[in-house]
Amino acid sequence: MAKYVKTEQGYQEIEATVAPMVGEKMNANNPVGTGSFSMGRKSGSVIGTNSHAEGFNTTASGERSHTEGASTTASGNSSHAEGASTTASSNSSHAEGMSTIASGEGSHAEGVSTLAEGNSSHAEGNTTTASGNYSHAEGVNTHAEGNSSHAEGNKTNARGKNSHAEGDGTIASSTNQHAQGRFNVADSHNKYAHIVGNGTNLSIRSNAHTLDWNGVPWFKGRPQFGGTAQDQGSQTVMANGDKEIILASSTANSTKKFKITVDDSGAISATEVI
């Protein structure tokens, strides 16, 4: 016989077989039940075996699933949905927060409008997407597309397998690549292991520094060697195919710098940099 419980929404049917029973009460010394249980389950929704639905307008249709909050759905087996308008649609998935979706097997979505669709993926923050298997997206509007990739910050995209993108609007498009800074130029040919972007926005991209897989660095500006980041000691400059070396004076407390050049005869000259 169906049993009912009074809630704020009126009388709700409890789809459960609870034993042992004493009248209409569970035995406090042995509160064991089998079957499904609901308080606030969405009317007409599918009831999963051994599922539990509570809150308002919730659906626990997966076997052994649990849903709570408002308008949440746990349709995957052993899934869990909580919060508001969240969906855990795959087996062993977990969705929490607001308007989040965990559609990958064993995935976890939390925050606001996040999507964890890769198997064992994790999406958190606001409007993030973890579509690669074992991927992780966090921050705001980030995308972890490659398997085992990680995207964090703001509008970053980790497209390559095992890639990592961080900062603002960066793209790590190749396997095992790392991109940081802001708005770098995407490298789809896997030339670089490391990229530091210094672009202006999503439409105006540029790089400050790259490092290729042979360990060869490139710098947009003049690299600094020695001294400190504040005093900018000696410098090495490569521009227009010519090589110049700028060295700080070795005299104590001197602030002078000299440009060292070598001509075709091998003669070396030093000119003070004003």
Question: Can you say where each PLM-predicted feature lies in the sequence?
Answer:
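Short, solvent-exposed loop/turn motifs
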Residues: Y11-E13, A229, K257
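Extended, folded domain segments that form the structural surfaces/walls around functional sites
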Residues: A229-N240
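Amphipathic alpha-helical oligomerization/assembly segments
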Residues: G10, V18, V22-K25, E244-I246, ...
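Short, intrinsically disordered N-terminal pre-domain segments
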Residues: M1-A16, I274
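Extracellular repetitive beta-rich solenoid segments
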Residues: T7, H189-Y192, N198-P217, G221, ...
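Periodic small-residue-enriched repeat registers in elongated scaffold domains
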Residues: A2, A16-F225, A229-D231
